[in-house]
């Protein structure tokens, strides 16, 4: 096959990448919301926050998104979604197969690809290969005001490199089972009064309900979604049923949107 391809030399390749990357970082160094983790709850939250018009930045330590979605159930490529979470998946055109009334099977690759695409199309910025190392805090009133970030590769190499800071009106811990951001804040800012009892063993029916109910603010400016909620609130895990994950993301997005709107009204 003969084809005419535009000639682009190495200097232009590098310059365009550096310029556009730096413009993104410069713009998002002051964000409305920073979400840590691009798993199901983080992507769901990003979709609804960006859709609400908030400047939303998602940091993912890996070079891919989806979190636990990609692993499916013990590497089986299917997952379970139950009502009313199916409405969120339908909203972003993810296909579902009903296996009993109100219970659906979803393909894991389609689930994470379309959910991520929906968040990006809504206006969220997702940056891979970045680890959130710490938080920014302020006093009077005491609150979380952003995050400190580092390249994941730098941390893996155990290099002593200072982070850079990203300001945010709200920080969402969507890091999963370890609730990494909230754990750091609890340890380093004891004045926040955060106590983390840890996640319990599996009890799927209760876990799905309790995770959504307990989603939300942990301290001023700091929120939990998804499996981070189970860790922070001492709730059971649920395994490869993902309804609560996307519902939790939507719930935290709604709470943050209301909180930021209230703060703008007061200002």
Curated annotation (Swiss-Prot):
GO biological process assignments: thiamine biosynthetic process; thiamine diphosphate biosynthetic process; thiazole biosynthetic process
What are the binding positions for Fe cation in this chain? 162, 177
* Biochemical pathway: Cofactor biosynthesis; thiamine diphosphate biosynthesis
Q: Its Enzyme Commission number?
A: 2.4.2.59
Keyword set for this entry? Iron, Metal-binding, NAD, Thiamine biosynthesis, Transferase
Which Gene3D superfamilies would you find in this protein's record?
A: FAD/NAD(P)-binding domain (3.50.50.60)
Its catalytic activity? hydrogen sulfide + glycine + NAD(+) = ADP-5-ethyl-4-methylthiazole-2-carboxylate + nicotinamide + 3 H2O + H(+)
Sites where the protein binds glycine:
237
Cofactor(s) recorded for this entry are: Fe(2+)
Residues binding NAD(+): 41, 60-61, 68, 132, 160-162, 227
Picking any one GO molecular function of the record gives: iron ion binding
- What HAMAP family does the record tag this protein with? Thi4
What is the stated purpose of this protein? Answer: Involved in the biosynthesis of the thiazole moiety of thiamine. Catalyzes the conversion of NAD and glycine to adenosine diphosphate 5-(2-hydroxyethyl)-4-methylthiazole-2-carboxylate (ADT), an adenylated thiazole intermediate, using free sulfide as a source of sulfur.
Say which family it is in.
Answer: Belongs to the THI4 family.
This one is known as Thiamine thiazole synthase
């Amino acid at each position: 096959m003969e084809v005419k391809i535009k000639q682009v030399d190495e200097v232009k390749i590098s310059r365009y990448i550096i310029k556009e990357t730096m413009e993104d970082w410069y713009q998002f160094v002051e964000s409305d919301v920073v979400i840590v983790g691009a798993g199901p709850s983080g992507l769901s939250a990003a979709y609804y926050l960006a859709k609400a018009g908030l400047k939303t930045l998602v940091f993912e330590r890996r070079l891919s998104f989806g979190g636990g979605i990609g692993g499916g159930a013990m590497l089986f490529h299917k997952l379970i979604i139950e009502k009313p979470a199916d409405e969120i998946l339908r909203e972003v055109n993810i296909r579902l197969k009903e296996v009993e009334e109100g219970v659906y099977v979803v393909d894991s690759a389609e689930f994470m690809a379309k959910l991520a695409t929906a968040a990006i199309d809504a206006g969220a910025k997702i940056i891979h290969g970045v680890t959130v190392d710490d938080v920014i805090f302020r006093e009077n009133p005491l609150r979380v005001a952003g995050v400190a970030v580092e390249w994941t590769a730098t941390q893996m190499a155990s290099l002593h490199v200072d982070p850079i800071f990203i300001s945010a009106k709200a920080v969402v811990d969507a890091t999963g089972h370890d609730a990494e951001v909230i754990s750091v804040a609890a340890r380093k800012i004891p004045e926040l009064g955060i106590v983390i009892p840890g996640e319990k063993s599996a009890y799927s029916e209760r876990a799905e309900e309790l995770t959504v109910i307990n989603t939300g603010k942990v301290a001023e400016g700091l929120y939990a979604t998804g499996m981070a909620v189970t860790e922070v609130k001492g709730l059971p895990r649920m395994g490869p049923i993902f309804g609560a994950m996307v519902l939790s993301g939507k719930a935290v997005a709604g709470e943050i949107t209301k909180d930021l709107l209230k703060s703008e009204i007061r200002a």
